[in-house]
Amino acid sequence: MDRVVGGKFKLGRKLGSGSFGEIFLGVNVQTGEEVAVKLEPLRARHPQLHYESKLYMLLQGGTGIPHLKWFGVEGEFNCMVIDLLGPSMEEFFNYCSRSFSLKTVLMLADQMINRVEYMHVKGFLHRDIKPDNFLMGLGRKANQVYIIDYGLAKKYRDLQTHKHIPYRENKNLTGTARYASVNTHLGIEQSRRDDLESLGYLLMYFLRGSLPWQGLRAGTKKQKYDKISEKKRLTPVEVLCKNFPPEFTSYFLYVRSLRFEDKPDYSYLKRLFRDLFIREGYQFDYVFDWTILRYPQFGSSSSSNSKPRPTLRPAMNIPVPSADKAEKPPIGQDSRERFSGVFEAYTRRNGSGTGVQADQSSRPRTSENVLASKDTQNQERPNSLSRNLSSSRKAIAGSSVRATSSADFTENRLSRLIPNNDRSSTTLRTQFAPSSSSVATKAAPTRAARDITLQSLELLSIGNSKRK
């Protein structure tokens, strides 16, 4: 007999696992909606699922914020039921041969800045900005960027008094070393400026294909972090952003000039990239690089590329810079399984003929609002008390895989909850989610995974008539 959690969510096959517990595909038996179900043992050494669910509730209502369906205790487990989302930026990056065009980066940057700003308005720092923590939506939200993984989020000010947390030093590094700010490496308490600096590194990673401090070798994690910190501090932003528009240098110079408690001028940062977008003659048509790879005819009409796209080749042949931890070897069949579930959902939801939408409910008509979103309005909207939150399989996996979490999630305990489920997969990686700690990176997908990607994207609705 299949197990049901929350009274209506039937558990299916396992999607992934980690020190936090395991993630399963689920379905709402009343509506047929597919969901992701995250299970955490009640006796976990560092339980965090309850904390994460509270973050979802506090952030609910914002554009690009996933929605939680249900949270509660079922048997020996904390359970969180979340909507499925599409692939992560890291997965799309691999799909695009680890290189994004300037147009794609600028379209993503505008939404990503909005997401970070929204979290800050709500009083929280994300503290783990990286490609794996930004996902695309499904169906009518297929071109909307979602920010996920609130396991390391921290409240930086009191929402009533607006009192900022105090400046501190000698802090351990929290987040992912590759994208951490210089001040974070130096042990300084993080604030809003650090999320934005991390986002800048993310954008340059997309443009360059890698960052100068990737692939450094060291004997211990501390030595590795020290080497990354030194290389990052000794790399001038002008060198980091060389051969790319000066707006990226301006971005770094601004965010690094902010003091600990300063409120960033998010509008200035978005305006930098919006003006560049217009000057390059791009159209905000939601035609991303991954769209062009599947539908080349859209490339000629969208002015999508500031440079020739690399030839699509098997991802296993793409050199992937070493992670901030030891890289995992390619996993063959596991990679096929890792991709299949998400693309099944991606195909079904995006091939329904409903079209896709991003932040705007209608196509922009003026240059001023060509990249604008509804985030500003959502930031002023009061929180609803309903527990209607959502995330992806990756959200649940990535948000909880922290180095400090080491719950013993045994197969015997799991079998009592889901006696008939296939538990053959023991990999710590899940669909479109890093399941190692925040400082890990994923191996490039296999040729089989790429084939699944191509097949599933065939039904993606991208016609202009479908965009509203």
From Swiss-Prot:
Location of the Protein kinase domain: 9-278
Low complexity composition bias: residue spans: 383-393
CDD domains linked to this entry: STKc_CK1_delta_epsilon (cd14125)
Enzyme class: transferase
Source superkingdom: Eukaryota
Gene Ontology cellular component list: cytoplasm; plasmodesma
Catalysed conversion reaction: L-seryl-[protein] + ATP = O-phospho-L-seryl-[protein] + ADP + H(+); L-threonyl-[protein] + ATP = O-phospho-L-threonyl-[protein] + ADP + H(+)
Residue ranges, annotated region (Disordered): 299-335, 349-447
Keyword presence, Mitochondrion: no
Post-translational modification: Autophosphorylated.
Sample GO molecular function, one term: protein serine/threonine kinase activity
Keywords: ATP-binding, Cell junction, Cytoplasm, Kinase, Nucleotide-binding, Serine/threonine-protein kinase, Transferase
Compositionally biased residues, Polar residues: 349-382, 421-440
Catalytic residues, chain numbering: D128
EC number: 2.7.11.1
Subcellular location: Cytoplasm; Cell junction, Plasmodesma
Record's compositionally biased regions (Basic and acidic residues): 324-335
Keyword ATP-binding attributed: yes
Residues the entry annotates as binding ATP: L15, G16, S17, G18, S19, F20, G21, E22, I23, K38
Subunit structure, interactors included: Monomer.
PANTHER family found in the cross-reference section: CASEIN KINASE-RELATED (PTHR11909)
Protein function: Casein kinases are operationally defined by their preferential utilization of acidic proteins such as caseins as substrates. It can phosphorylate a large number of proteins.
Family note: Belongs to the protein kinase superfamily. CK1 Ser/Thr protein kinase family. Casein kinase I subfamily.
Protein's name according to its UniProt entry: Casein kinase 1-like protein 13
Organism: Arabidopsis thaliana (Mouse-ear cress)
Origin organism lineage: Eukaryota, Viridiplantae, Streptophyta, Embryophyta, Tracheophyta
